[in-house]
């Protein structure tokens, strides 16, 4: 039951937290909260609608799906001064690359700052 409820957190409160991280990053780019929500809200709604119609794998897009490691590296550099937002970005990106179709996976993992998440998980389980 606890795992079910923990999983459900990703569908609502943590989705709101993810959008809040996006709003914070947008504010650093000079975009106010109202405008940021006007940009991110429809994007999030369209993504949820796509997932409902097509499933996770077919709805996954952007530089992680394309294997655009240079763009991912630029994102990380832009977020360096905001460690908590950068941590959220890295963690979600690592999970996405591990669980969803991604071109150029090794280069994306390197751009995210390390080797395979699967390998790091295995190492931590040994200790």
Predicted segment positions?
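C-terminal active-site/capping subdomain that shapes the small-molecule cofactor and substrate pocket
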Residues: 55-127
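Helical "substrate-binding/catalytic lid" subdomain
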Residues: 1-79, 85
């Amino acid at each position: 039951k606890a795992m079910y409820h923990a999983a459900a957190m990703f569908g609502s409160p943590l989705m709101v937290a993810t959008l809040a991280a996006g709003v914070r990053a947008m504010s650093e780019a000079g975009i106010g909260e109202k405008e940021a929500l006007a940009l991110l809200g429809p994007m999030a709604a369209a993504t949820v609608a796509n997932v409902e119609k097509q499933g996770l794998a077919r709805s996954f897009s952007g530089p992680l799906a394309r294997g655009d490691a240079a763009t991912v590296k630029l994102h990380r550099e832009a977020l360096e001064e905001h460690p908590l937002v950068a941590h959220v970005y890295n963690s979600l990106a690592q999970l996405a690359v591990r669980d969803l179709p991604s071109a150029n996976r090794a280069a994306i993992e390197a751009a995210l700052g390390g080797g395979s998440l699967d390998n790091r998980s295995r190492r931590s389980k040994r200790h």
